[in-house]
Amino acid sequence: MDRIKEIRKAIDSIDTDLLKLLNDRAQLAIELGEIKNELRLAIYDPSREREIIKMMLSKNDGPLDDQAVVGLFQRIIDESRRVEKFSVSSDKNITTENKQRESK
């Protein structure tokens, strides 16, 4: 039972780290969206998305299989694209939007 608690504590710590890293990535996506908007570049760049997936697959040593890696990174990319679009379509804060959604 103690080992289960230890493992869960380690997982919780990793989850906290992942959340911080994902929010850091989202912040960079917001900045990228603003720059793309200034340069009149499209938010959606399928070749860049394919490049990210390919790079992550090449770095995958498991135990996650490639299908899991593709699914996870596709979701991360989708959310990054969403915050990029949001950053140029509104002056609202992403965090404010999330809090409003949670209160409903």
What are these regions (language model features)?
Residues 1-104:
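Domain-level signature for soluble enzymes in the chorismate/prephenate branch of the shikimate pathway
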